[in-house]
Amino acid sequence: MSTTALADVEYVVHSLAQTAVEKEKEFGDLDAVVGDGDLGYSLARGFEKVLADWDSLKRDDAATFLQQIALAISSRIGGTSGPLWGTAFLRASAAAKGADTIDGAAVVAMLRGATDGIKARGNSDLGDKTLLDALIPGTDELERRLAAGASPEECRTAFAAKVRECADATSTMEAKRGRASYSGERSIGSPDAGAVAVAVIIERIVADWP
């Protein structure tokens, strides 16, 4: 694998980790509207571990690196978030295994692996008012742009925009999974905290792309 390809993966993960830590209160406040309010705390603790271990993580290839991330966050994130995020990174790692380069198709495969892992681990799908309602349509849009021959910058921008659009749209949905589902119809009117967190993270990744 090229050094540049691995560097891109490292950048994405490092940006994700920094945003999760910096936005702890914001994500927690979002989650507290109809959830248990621990999303910000859980993500921050998990990705603090990633940042603390950063220099010692194995970097043989993208798959190995992502597997190390999965293990790091799973060891620190409690509740339901740990298994979900850990599984997402493990599935992304599996999708990247054997890849010599990380091109657009590989990114889509990694995102599909991550969302499939979240579906299986969380017993959730589109329409349940979770981060899947933002990440899956975003991945679909990315794949469509790639097929149309859009530039890398156009693809990244469109991906982030679609994730944000769909995250905001979860405010019209009733939660069917997680603590928010206990609120029933009262969950309508506010967006899913996980979906918004993913949108914020991806917007930061795209805005600061090196």
Enumerate the language-model features and the residues they cover.
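N-terminal loops that bind phosphate or other acidic moieties
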Residues: 1-210
